[in-house]
């Protein structure tokens, strides 16, 4: 299959380039900028896109355009730093901009296949402190903004393009059309990426690989693992065994909902009740990083024991399926090549595959979350399961600030349930990316009836986001928040105050721990 290969130069938006291209029906993959010639050629590239990045081309050890990229003789598009790197490569001049450009700018464009079907002026999103001061020989201007005279360029052959703005972000008008024009008009690539074809290929692939053996799956009830469970069921039926671990850190009635949802889908699941074990291991622990590690290790132990019992019972379990997504693969590749600052330990059960005697199946390892949701819809997963808000692997433990106790879990489950219930009642649930309640480790004075109270505080958090990398706090109606706060204080024993978190990401993370 022909592929649009995106080389990553470090931009926070790089994954969006791949997603935008795929959304238009063309297969794309992401590689680090210093990937080998063989890595790129193995993908059968039809076009190359160079992402943006934080470096300056004149810095020591700055990422550069590898020679072999030019030797491939296929169309190239450089975005932001990618543009500057191309200009530098061909002998042009890049310097610090006299005025940094961050945010909206008006782009004026000339007639060109890259801008076919677009108006002569439109808004784009800039994010750069360097700019091109002189074009290399053989290049010409096809777009300019007030502060970037070379905001869009190409060579005279029309095979190498560069744009100073970011077409991959939603802030750029017609950005997806620009990327599509590059792939279809410039690179002459035919559409080759369709979810129905992918599903059929994966089902056949799983059947061929697994044969008559059995597959176990760690089922959380979230979107990724639920869609994997459904795909495995379509492929191998009862030879797929989903395992659901009840950690005691789930939302109110979540175990019952998961069991009921999969009963309706006709899929049998194995439920392991490990509530007491998780709570016992967490006793007295307040540090969030320590809580995550304990939960991760406990989950591995519980899942391992359950798997060994099933192996003893069935004998022919040979595979472990995981809901690994493309961003997980990308992040692991990045971390292999360079050290990255760790903000939180992620609960992706990292030690599980090494401990279990099974081969790994990851049917979605090259998919993004929105693509998995599309597959779920095609396979018949109910909308309420497809559109569920993200839920952290450690569960409510990272929404209880401080020690996790039975009392805190019950209070938080009830408060969170009220918040989500009201969001759904008021048609707001699908309008926010994620919403939840947080149990705070403080008490406050209050008055109920004629009595003084000294009870717990609940924080509400709701954010709008595209992919969780950045997020804005949701401007929920005041009347709605008032109603939720009243219900929580009146219906949840032990709570006398409710606050609303109005911090965006950055500087805060979405979860409190």
UniProtKB/Swiss-Prot annotation:
Domain Glutamine amidotransferase type-1: 3-192
Pathway field: Purine metabolism; GMP biosynthesis; GMP from XMP (L-Gln route): step 1/1
EC class name: ligase
Enzyme Commission number(s): 6.3.5.2
Role played: Catalyzes the synthesis of GMP from XMP.
Keywords: ATP-binding, Glutamine amidotransferase, GMP biosynthesis, Ligase, Nucleotide-binding, Purine biosynthesis
Protein known as: GMP synthase [glutamine-hydrolyzing]
Taxonomic lineage from the root: Bacteria, Thermotogati, Thermotogota, Thermotogae, Thermotogales
Catalytic activity: XMP + L-glutamine + ATP + H2O = GMP + L-glutamate + AMP + diphosphate + 2 H(+)
Quaternary structure note: Homodimer.
Binding positions for ATP per the UniProt entry: 220-226
Xref: Pfam families: GATase, GMP_synt_C, NAD_synthase
Active-site residue numbers: 80, 166, 168
GO MF annotations in UniProt: ATP binding; GMP synthase activity
């Amino acid at each position: 299959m022909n592929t649009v290969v995106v080389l990553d130069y470090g931009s926070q938006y790089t994954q969006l380039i791949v997603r935008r291209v795929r959304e238009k029906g063309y297969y794309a993959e992401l590689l680090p900028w210093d990937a080998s010639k063989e890595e790129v050629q193995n993908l059968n590239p039809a076009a190359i896109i160079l992402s943006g990045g934080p470096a300056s081309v004149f810095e020591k050890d700055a990422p550069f355009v590898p020679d072999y990229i030019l030797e491939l003789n296929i169309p190239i598009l450089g975005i932001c730093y990618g543009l500057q790197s191309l200009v530098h490569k061909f002998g042009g001049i890049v310097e610090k901009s006299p005025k940094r450009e961050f945010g909206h700018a008006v782009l004026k464009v000339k007639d060109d296949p890259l801008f076919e079907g677009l108006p002569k002026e439109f808004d784009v999103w800039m994010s750069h402190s360097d700019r091109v001061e002189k074009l290399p020989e053989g290049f010409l201007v096809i777009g300019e903004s007030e502060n970037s005279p070379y905001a869009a360029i190409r060579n005279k052959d029309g095979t190498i393009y560069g744009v100073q703005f970011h077409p991959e972000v939603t802030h750029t008008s017609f950005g997806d059309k620009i990327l599509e024009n590059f792939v279809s008009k410039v690179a002459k690539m035919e559409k080759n990426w369709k979810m129905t074809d992918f599903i059929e290929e994966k089902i056949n692939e799983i059947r061929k690989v697994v044969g008559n053996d059995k597959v176990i799956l760690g089922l959380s009830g979230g979107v990724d693992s639920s869609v994997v469970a459904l795909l495995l069921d379509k492929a191998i039926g009862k030879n797929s065994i989903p395992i659901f671990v009840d950690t005691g850190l789930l939302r109110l009635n979540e175990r019952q909902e998961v069991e009921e949802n999969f009963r309706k889908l006709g899929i049998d699941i194995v439920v392991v009740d490990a509530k007491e074990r998780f709570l016992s291991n967490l006793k007295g622990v307040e540090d969030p990083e320590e809580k995550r590690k304990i939960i991760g290790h406990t989950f591995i132990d519980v899942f391992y024991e359950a798997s060994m019992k099933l192996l003893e019972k069935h004998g022919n379990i040979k595979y472990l399926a995981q809901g690994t997504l493309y961003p997980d693969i990308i992040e692991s590749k990045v971390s292999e090549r360079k050290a990255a600052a760790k903000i939180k330990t992620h609960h992706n059960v990292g030690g599980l595959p090494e401990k279990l005697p099974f081969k790994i199946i990851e049917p979605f390892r090259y998919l993004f979350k929105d693509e998995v949701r599309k597959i779920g819809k095609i396979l018949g997963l109910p909308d309420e399961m497809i559109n569920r808000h993200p839920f952290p692997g450690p569960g409510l433990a990272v929404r209880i600030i401080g020690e996790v106790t039975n009392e805190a879990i019950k209070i938080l489950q009830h408060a969170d349930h009220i918040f989500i219930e009201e969001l759904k009642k008021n048609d707001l649930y699908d309008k926010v990316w994620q919403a939840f309640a947080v149990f705070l480790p403080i008490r406050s004075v209050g008055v109920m009836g004629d009595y003084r109270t000294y009870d717990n505080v609940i924080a509400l958090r709701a954010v709008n986001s595209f992919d969780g990398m950045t997020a804005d706090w949701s401007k929920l109606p005041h009347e709605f928040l008032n109603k939720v706060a009243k219900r929580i204080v009146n219906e949840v024993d032990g709570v006398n105050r409710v606050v609303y978190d109005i911090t965006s990401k950055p500087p805060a993370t979405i979860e409190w721990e």
